[in-house]
């Protein structure tokens, strides 16, 4: 982290940090990054997303697990920006999801605001814990706590280390 650490991440920076790509890249922008502490991700929900074909035909509802994944991706971007991990083959793995509650349906046309706050973890730590809240127009859609392991490989995936 430096004085030049960005407080936002556009889709280009997000893709330099996260390995996820369509159809599993679930955050479009991250703003209000407070290094190693918190951030707000934005996910523009569109009818073109593949999960809406089967969840549910005629009544498209974003699966709750994808909302939680979007919060986790927001947290990973916050840590990645804070630790200057763009282009460094940064991987993150779920370790646990706790106290998850869904409060509102999310569907096409909604903009998810993904508020994440680190409750455990510090620069260089492998295990982090976060509190997350997903909102649409200020209304709570989902809340949970989750634990993730941050992994910075010494060589790119698929290459011998």
UniProtKB/Swiss-Prot annotation:
Domain of life: Bacteria
Main location: cytoplasm
GO-annotated molecular function: (3R)-hydroxyacyl-[acyl-carrier-protein] dehydratase activity
Catalytic activity, reaction form: a (3R)-hydroxyacyl-[ACP] = a (2E)-enoyl-[ACP] + H2O
Keyword match Hydrolase: no
Sorted UniProt keywords: Cytoplasm, Lipid A biosynthesis, Lipid biosynthesis, Lipid metabolism, Lyase
Compartment(s) where it occurs, according to its Swiss-Prot or TrEMBL record: Cytoplasm
GO CC entries: cytoplasm; membrane
EC top class, as a word: lyase
Family, as annotated: Belongs to the thioester dehydratase family. FabZ subfamily.
HAMAP family named among the record's database cross-references: FabZ (MF_00406)
Summary of the function given for this chain in its UniProt record: Involved in unsaturated fatty acids biosynthesis. Catalyzes the dehydration of short chain beta-hydroxyacyl-ACPs and long chain saturated and unsaturated beta-hydroxyacyl-ACPs.
Protein name per Swiss-Prot or TrEMBL: 3-hydroxyacyl-[acyl-carrier-protein] dehydratase FabZ
Organism, scientific name: Jannaschia sp. (strain CCS1)
